[in-house]
Amino acid sequence: VSILDGNTFVVSDQRGDIEASPTDTSGLFSYDTRFLSTWVLTVNGERLNTLSIDDLNYFESRFFLVPDTGTVYVNATMSVIRQRAVGGGFREALTVLNHADEPVKLTVRIDAGCDFADLFEVKDAAKKKGKYYHRINHSSLLLGYQRETFNRETTISSTAPCKYDENGLTFELRIGAHSEWSTDLTVATSLVEEISRQKVRGKADRSPDLAANLKKWMARTPKMLCDVPSLDVTYERSLVDLAALRFSPRIAGGRSLPAAGLPWFMAMFGRDSILTSLQALPFVPELAETTLRALATWQGTVLDDFRDEDPGRIVHEMRYGETAAFEEQPHSPYYGNADATPLFVVLLDEYERWTGDSKVVKELEPEARAALAWIDDYADLQGNGYVSYKRRNEKTGLENQCWKDSWDSISYRDGRLPDFPRATCELQGYAYDAKMRGARLARTFWKDPAYADELTRQATDLKRRFNQDFWLPDRQAFALALDADGSKVDALASNMGHLLWSGIVDKAKAKAVVRHLMGPKLFTGWGIRTLAEGEARFNPIGYHVGAVWPFDNSFIAWGMRNYGFKVEAARVAAGILDAAAFFRGRLPEAFGGYERSYTMYPVEYPTACSPQAWSTGAPLLLLRTMLGLEPTEDRISVDPVLPKEIGHLALLDIPGRWGRVDVYGRGRA
């Protein structure tokens, strides 16, 4: 059972208990540290059984519990309610109810413990290098950990009288007949440190009014009307989950950007935050501004092999845990990606097109120019004019620095893995798109027509060369990548779908690309696989080698739409949105790439993040795609092509440079 607020989250069992171990990664986490590894409730020394759980909201849950009666029948004379809310730390309202005709004496105990494990250590049970300490007074229990200047503390308190010890707190109760007892428990987290690249001080516990905040968030978003109830559920779930995944980096001045996903990626990720902001632009454009400003703040300035940092490079990942603080991991911050930098320029341009906010474009001109310069000055590792990647941090850096960042995601048709550097095809599309959009910004806002002309010339040349060098004539498809020798990595993969939304594909080749994407080797009926069936490494439950990723499909569908393949885009949208209904409206990070005719439902991927930011954003981009929404100067153009399963669809109060508008569409595809 999970509840979350930004990068603070709680994972517990069905009773609400936390018992962390290398095989049980439960706990209270904040800023990449587990602040609570034990939180176990007993009554008279016995654990409780679960009657039901209320998933009240993303930040709140309630557990209804009873003692073990020793029979299959629940005939308890006592029950317990735990109502929990998260926000920095967490708060738990604990209520014990006596249903008997006589008073009862009870010993209620909360065992509490903190291992202060780094998020990267929770599965390892590694021995900590610092020292644990505790302090007890009449009103609280403080548990702490310190390693040099790295300091984390958890403070536990109760509104009702209790006895604290270093392992928890105990209540000795006498509850009258048909009466109840309650207390409010607070678990507050704090962090104090000073490390090489970042300074963090103060408490992490914000205790905001999350319910009021969510209400305001939902009130600002467009209202959807349609005749498909499951789509209503998916739309609302997407907006709520996007609210849940918001967090405020300490550099963002209290404004929010999307964290990547629960549980392992509740942090700022350049690529994920950019793509999620792109997906959500027609619905919550304010996410994009915060994302752009935060990433601009952490843009690379020097050559640093440990962090894979270059001047102009956009950050990949920012962590606050112990391993980052002592550079056992390079994530404070880490720059090892090859796509976030061009995508930064893409988002900046798309943000202005939707909002008309030229102020941000002008303020971020130096960062955008630095990002564009990075493409030519640092990303062309092979000297052939293409963006490629090879980690300089051989010990802890990422090998694959494209979005498919697992070890086996880039392979030849026969399963061999290419040497580094690797130039994956979609990176070239992003670079092309960034240059074209950068040219528009330079000409319109930066008043530099010569620079705009140069970027346009570079983009045109890149498109010409790409359509020659990456094309596989025998397969009528684009290669997955070029290897270290400049030879084509000839596997068929979903990466070529991203070429469509970037616009780098010659129109004469687009039909062949779409034919592959919608063919039986890639399209399952639920969505497009990451790797085509028949390729040597294909596995329908392989992370990047056969599973279906909703975010991937949303951008592919958008690209199809941009090339005029509106019906095909609607089919992809229909498959993904059908799948969402089987996940109660919450699309996971990925699901199995099995043919739809084999299964009555999409097969779950066992370790998928959920909620996950760009999966949460996928239905939003698919709605934009189906309705054909495009900003055109000071108005929005609409060209709906909906799956026939959707009779009618309306979005009301879409925000943008035009104010707010309503759009409508009917299903015909």
Q: Locations of the language-model features?
A:
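Aromatic/His-enriched, Gly/Pro-containing loop or helix-boundary segments
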Residues: 71-83, 130-131, 161-163, 311-341, ...
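Acidic/polar, glycine-enriched structural segments that form the non-catalytic walls/loops
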Residues: 89-91, 98-267, 358-365, 369-380, ...
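An extended acidic
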Residues: 1-77, 84-89, 99-103, 114-121, ...
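Beta-rich accessory regions
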Residues: 105, 174-176, 182, 441, ...
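Alpha-helical support elements that line or immediately flank enzyme active sites
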Residues: 272-303, 495-507, 553-569, 573-576
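Extended glycan-interaction surfaces of carbohydrate-active proteins
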Residues: 64-67, 225-268, 293-335, 381-423, ...
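Catalytic cores of secreted or luminal carbohydrate-active enzymes
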Residues: 608-646
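Extended, well-ordered alpha-helical scaffold segments
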Residues: 197-209, 213, 230-237, 284-298, ...
